[in-house]
């Protein structure tokens, strides 16, 4: 009798095989977890899938607001917005910067003062930054005003993500970088230079990693650091890096930003934690979307006194030469959504749910094999349409 009970509880000769056959016959992508329900490994795989389900569900009504247009002469940050809504759930709306300026002009001084006080309370800063009447204080004040305006318009529209563009700032006196940093920390997706796909992907990254300890951020391949086996990529942007990845308390500073309107600009300055993570991006290849994921290791950066921005320094797996070459061959963006907590498995599940291509660059990647994979994928995704 006992043997029969054990067999009944664990037998799958008919149930999962039959169901698996039916779903395979229907050409349905899905995750298969094999293991006892009390095993930690099986529970972990299911937990990963559940987090991805939550992120996927959140994306299905995701509104991304583009304040201004794309950065000029940049193709990779744009894409087919109709296909993006059909495949990924993203709805992308354009909002003239002047509409945001109307919100900005309507912000009350008392609310700005409260926000400025919050800045000085939460972040390290030079004492002279609190001196009213100075240009630096005015920049902090205007940054607070811009943050309040952004919060209000995002709430009114129901947007979960947004983009800005330093080429399209209207009457603003500085790019709203400080506001973008703080809004990312609270879960709003952000993409610079009109990059709505990365803005949406960051929102999903943040959503899937809720309750995890290490953090995530929008990042950009800023500059290459060639140093033998320690060759790495400096990850930064003009300003917009999320404080969730900061190693220590961020410092509020005001410095000149010569990109865009060339003005003194408030920002949070910090360096990232050390440790392993994954960087992800989605690109539009014309006939499909491709998710590119690279395992990376964030290392300690030397002081960068002439680059007062938030930053991370990472070595892409398996090393800079192979990792960067593979990323370029795959058509990857210079923007990514980065997480210390998520693993490749999360993005595999996400790609399965979305029904999109995924390529992984990790410690086992070689250029010759990676090229073969890209070529085979090209054929597969053309033929796969005929099977659906």
Q: What is the predicted role of each segment?
A:
Residues 79-87, 178-181, 353-356:
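Short, solvent-exposed amphipathic alpha-helical segments in soluble enzyme
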Residues 2-6:
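Short, small-residue-biased leader/transition segments that mark boundaries at the very start
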Residues 7-129:
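Cap/lid and interdomain-hinge subdomains that line or gate substrate/regulatory clefts
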């Amino acid at each position: 009798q006992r043997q029969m009970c054990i067999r009944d509880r664990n037998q799958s000769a008919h149930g999962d095989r039959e169901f698996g056959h039916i779903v395979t016959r229907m050409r349905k992508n899905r995750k298969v977890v094999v293991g006892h329900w009390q095993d930690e490994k099986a529970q972990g795989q299911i937990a990963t899938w559940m987090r991805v389900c939550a992120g996927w569900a959140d994306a299905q009504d995701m509104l991304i607001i583009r304040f201004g247009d794309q950065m000029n002469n940049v193709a990779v940050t744009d894409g087919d917005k109709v296909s993006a809504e059909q495949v990924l759930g993203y709805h992308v709306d354009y909002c003239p910067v002047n509409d945001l300026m109307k919100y900005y002009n309507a912000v009350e001084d008392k609310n700005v003062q409260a926000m400025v006080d919050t800045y000085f309370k939460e972040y390290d800063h030079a004492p002279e930054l609190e001196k009213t009447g100075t240009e630096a204080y005015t920049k902090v004040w205007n940054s607070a005003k811009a943050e309040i305006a952004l919060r209000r318009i995002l709430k009114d529209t129901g947007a979960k993500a947004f983009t800005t563009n330093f080429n399209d700032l209207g009457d603003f006196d500085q790019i709203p970088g400080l506001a973008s940093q703080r809004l990312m920390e609270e879960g709003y997706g952000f993409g610079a230079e009109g990059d709505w796909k990365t803005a949406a992907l960051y929102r999903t990254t943040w959503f899937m990693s809720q309750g995890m300890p290490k953090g995530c951020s929008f990042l950009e391949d800023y500059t290459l650091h060639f140093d033998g086996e320690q060759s790495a990529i400096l990850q930064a942007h003009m300003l917009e890096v999320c404080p969730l990845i900061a190693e220590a308390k961020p410092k509020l500073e005001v410095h000149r930003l010569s990109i865009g309107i060339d003005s003194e600009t408030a920002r949070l300055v910090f360096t990232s934690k050390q440790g392993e993570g994954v960087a992800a991006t989605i690109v539009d290849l014309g006939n499909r979307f491709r998710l590119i994921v690279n395992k990376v290791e964030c290392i300690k950066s030397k002081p960068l006194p002439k680059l007062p921005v938030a930053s991370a320094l990472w070595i892409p797996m398996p090393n800079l030469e192979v990792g960067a070459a593979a990323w370029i061959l795959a058509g990857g963006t210079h923007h990514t959504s980065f997480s210390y907590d998520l693993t490749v498995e999360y993005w595999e599940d996400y790609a399965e749910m979305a029904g999109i291509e995924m390529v992984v660059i990790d410690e086992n990647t070689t250029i010759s094999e990676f090229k073969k994979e890209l070529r085979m994928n090209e054929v597969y995704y053309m033929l796969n349409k005929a099977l659906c």
